[in-house]
């Protein structure tokens, strides 16, 4: 009896696709996105990330044509994580090909909710493979830090090298976790 054989590449591709499917299903959003290819940013909020975006930004689940971008908005000082407090807040997001946001690719707006602890997961699609993008979030009175992400290589690509970095929930309250900086510095 012969057993089917999967190459390491096929196994990793299958595992990645399965994980993305689970996360995308679990983290759906009510995103009102717009293709703004080639346009410039219209966000005019003040850059005060500690006011509304105390938890920063993150990205993950890279596919050749998509990434997930994340943030947590703090709509009021008492809306700390896990409290269930804070009014629903309109949050704008942008993703661009440059750090100055002069070449926007997409933008949109979503509503945060205490039911989701004011965390936002945006599945940004229709991106180019192996491409770096910059992203950010804004409210009417706050602008998040800018994040940088990169899409995965095309499915038929054969890159000379491919590196993965994996992190899990770090419970920031127990340390500063310099490991994240080391991961970013290795890029």
Predicted regions and their residues:
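N-terminal secretory signal peptides and thylakoid transit peptides that target proteins
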Residues: 1-22
């Amino acid at each position: 009896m012969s057993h089917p054989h999967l190459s390491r590449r096929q196994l990793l591709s299958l595992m990645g696709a399965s994980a993305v499917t689970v996360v995308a299903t679990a983290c759906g959003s009510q995103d009102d996105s717009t293709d703004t290819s080639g346009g410039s940013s219209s966000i005019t909020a003040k850059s005060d990330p500690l006011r509304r975006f105390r938890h920063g930004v993150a990205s993950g689940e890279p596919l050749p044509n998509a990434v997930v971008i994340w943030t947590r908005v703090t709509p009021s000082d008492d809306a700390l994580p896990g409290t269930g407090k804070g009014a629903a807040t309109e949050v704008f997001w942008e993703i661009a090909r440059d750090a100055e946001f002069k070449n926007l690719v997409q933008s949109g707006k979503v509503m945060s909710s205490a039911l989701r602890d004011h965390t936002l997961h945006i599945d940004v699609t229709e991106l180019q493979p192996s491409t770096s993008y910059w992203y950010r979030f804004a409210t009417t009175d706050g602008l998040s830090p800018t994040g940088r992400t990169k899409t995965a290589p095309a499915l038929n690509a054969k890159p000379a090298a491919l590196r993965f970095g994996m992190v899990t929930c770090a419970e920031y309250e127990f340390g500063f976790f310099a490991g994240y900086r080391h991961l970013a510095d290795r890029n």
